[in-house]
């Protein structure tokens, strides 16, 4: 399994954050089957605060299906709460959407791994592109927010692929990673990035947020202070 963290200051091993991440691979067949079997029941909404993700021709497209998020991170979940307020409830200390009932193995696996800040399922149209942008999610004062993409149901088509490009600011280069079934890419969402789907089919991924806490990774703090890019200035 290829596991990559792309950020403005370099790479990081995802297993340092979530050592049990291989549970996704161990349970992937069940996770994918549950998703495919229940796709018609899953509710998708939009991130109306992110035009690059959600807007096309002046019309918002349903692109994200919320699963859960931490109770004290309401601002990050606000657009989904406003759309699906009645469908959220509290479970195990998390703000949970009824979508989790259709993907129980995925939900349990993410939480077994220790991913609690936010999780959702995102879809992308055939032959579509999310243009270069940066997400507006703020970093916590004592850490750095990271976003993960797990390939959940990505069609296979010869000569075509779905991929993400993330800018490496210090090197003035781009990191490119394919998005395919079982692939995992973890990056800093307020780094400039773009997603391209060349495939003639809908692409579905799991999106999740997690945090590198400075107290646990002092080398990250040292690197950020040395490079001066921790504040994501461009």
Report each predicted region and the residues it spans.
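Non-heme Fe(II)/2-oxoglutarate
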Residues: 2-112
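Hydrophobic transmembrane signal anchors and adjacent membrane-proximal interface regions, especially
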Residues: 3-10, 14-19, 23-26, 44, ...
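Intrinsically disordered, low-complexity peptide-like regions
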Residues: 11, 59, 131-133, 207
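Short loop/turn segments at secondary-structure transitions that flank enzyme active sites
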Residues: 37, 127, 154-156, 193, ...
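Catalytic core of non-heme Fe(II) oxygenases with the double-stranded beta-helix
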Residues: 99-185
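Catalytic core of Fe(II)/2-oxoglutarate
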Residues: 162-234
């Amino acid at each position: 399994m290829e596991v990559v963290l792309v950020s403005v200051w370099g790479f990081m091993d995802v297993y340092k954050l979530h050592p049990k991440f291989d549970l996704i691979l161990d349970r992937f067949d069940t996770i994918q089957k549950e998703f495919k079997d229940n796709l018609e029941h899953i509710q998708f909404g939009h991130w109306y605060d992110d035009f690059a993700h959600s807007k096309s021709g002046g019309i918002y497209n349903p692109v994200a299906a919320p699963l859960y998020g931490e109770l004290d991170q309401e601002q990050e979940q606000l657009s989904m709460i406003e759309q699906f307020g009645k469908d959220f409830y509290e479970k195990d200390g998390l703000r949970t959407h009824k979508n989790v009932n259709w993907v129980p193995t995925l939900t349990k696996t993410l939480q077994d791994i220790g991913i609690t800040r936010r999780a959702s399922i995102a879809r992308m149209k055939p032959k579509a592109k999310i243009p270069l942008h940066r997400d507006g999610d703020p970093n916590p004062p004592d850490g750095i927010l990271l976003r993960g993409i797990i390939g959940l149901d990505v069609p296979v088509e010869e000569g075509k692929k779905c991929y993400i490009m993330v800018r490496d600011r210090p090197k003035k280069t781009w990191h490119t990673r394919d998005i395919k079934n079982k692939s995992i890419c973890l990056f800093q969402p307020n780094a400039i990035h773009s997603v391209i789907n060349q495939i003639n089919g809908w692409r579905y991924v799991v999106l999740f947020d997690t945090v590198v806490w400075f107290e646990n990774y002092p080398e990250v703090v040292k690197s950020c202070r040395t490079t001066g890019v921790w504040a994501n200035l461009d």
